[in-house]
Amino acid sequence: MDLFMSIFTLGAITRNPAKIENASPASTVHATATIPLQATFPFGWLIVGVALLAVFQSASKVIALHRRWQLALYKGVQLVCNMLLLFVTIYSHLLLLAACMEAQFLYIYALIYILQIVSFCRFIMRCWLCWKCRSKNPLLYDANYFVCWHTNNYDYCIPYNSVTDTVVITSGDGTNQPKLKEDYQIGGYSEDWHSGVKDYVVIYGYFTEVYYQLESTQLSTDTGAENATFFIYSKLVKDVDHVQIHTIDGSSGVVNPAMDPIYDEPTTTTSVPL
């Protein structure tokens, strides 16, 4: 009980000798005592603050995640909560250290610090993935892989679940059944329409870079969606520097993937839906 009270009243530490004044055997009730452990910011309020922080962080999950600004708001709230949690952890650790009560909680703090380091390393890896994809989407989405292609107008980066043999990109035109927006979709993720597609796409992961070449284009599949274009890509087994593509006029050739895209800004000669 004494240990609990010492922790709960722990704050800015001021140690003074304990003494009792005006004490007499006949009247001990009216004695004045000086407590050796003074707290200007009680440790108990830190516990309440952490509890409120956890509630606030959990409540932020009710934010709708349909738009990019909503995703950015949610991730921003999570980042602020994590920073506050780190501050509270360090502050409480320093208080316990000043009160010479660190030993009882050393393993708990070690676990907290390890989790914080893992979270920080993950944030650094997501930033590195943003650099690889030339997009901020890896910071907004929790996917481990991203399908990317780059045009003169826009850098596309769509979350993906895993490395597969085939990638299908659905392009809507606003009249699809079921209703789709005018964008590119892969699974449940989408990217607004800014430009066309290329003859190849790349799946980026933390330590993954897999190239896919456009194999065919279909206007309908067995998915039930109509008035949509499906771009079907197959994994490349050849060297990345020698990609065989088919140009618009039907000829074929060997080009470097770093060249300008075949399906870029829409023209009357491309097969990209307007």
UniProtKB/Swiss-Prot annotation:
Residue ranges that the UniProt entry lists as topological domain Cytoplasmic: 56-78, 126-274
Entry-linked PROSITE patterns: COV_VIROPORIN_3A_CD (PS51967), COV_VIROPORIN_3A_TM (PS51966)
Site (Involved in polymerization) residue list: 133
Location of the protein in the cell: Virion; Host Golgi apparatus membrane; Host cell membrane; Secreted
GO cellular component: extracellular region; host cell Golgi membrane; host cell plasma membrane; membrane; virion component
Glycosylation sites per record: 27-28, 32, 34
Source organism superkingdom: Viruses
Signal recorded as keyword: no
Extracellular side of membrane: 1-34, 100-104
Record's bilayer topology term: Multi-pass membrane protein
Record keywords: Apoptosis, Glycoprotein, Host cell membrane, Host cytoplasm, Host Golgi apparatus, Host membrane, Ion channel, Ion transport, Membrane, Secreted, Transmembrane, Transmembrane helix, Transport, Viral ion channel, Virion
CDD domains the record matches: SARS-CoV-like_ORF3a (cd21648)
Spans traversing the lipid bilayer: 35-55, 79-99, 105-125
Residue span(s) of domain CoV 3a-like viroporin CD: 145-237
Gene Ontology MF terms in the entry: monoatomic ion channel activity
Ribosomal protein among keywords: no
PTM field: Exists in both O-glycosylated and non-glycosylated forms. The glycosylated form is associated with the virion.
Subunit relationships: Homotetramer composed of two homodimers linked non covalently. Interacts with M, S and E proteins. Also interacts with the accessory protein 7a.
Additional remark text: Bat coronavirus HKU3 is highly similar to SARS-CoV (SARS-like).
This protein's domain notes: The second or the third transmembrane region are responsible for Golgi localization.
Record's function text: Forms homotetrameric potassium sensitive ion channels (viroporin) and may modulate virus release. Up-regulates expression of fibrinogen subunits FGA, FGB and FGG in host lung epithelial cells. Induces apoptosis in cell culture. Down-regulates the type 1 interferon receptor by inducing serine phosphorylation within the IFN alpha-receptor subunit 1 (IFNAR1) degradation motif and increasing IFNAR1 ubiquitination.
Protein name: Protein 3
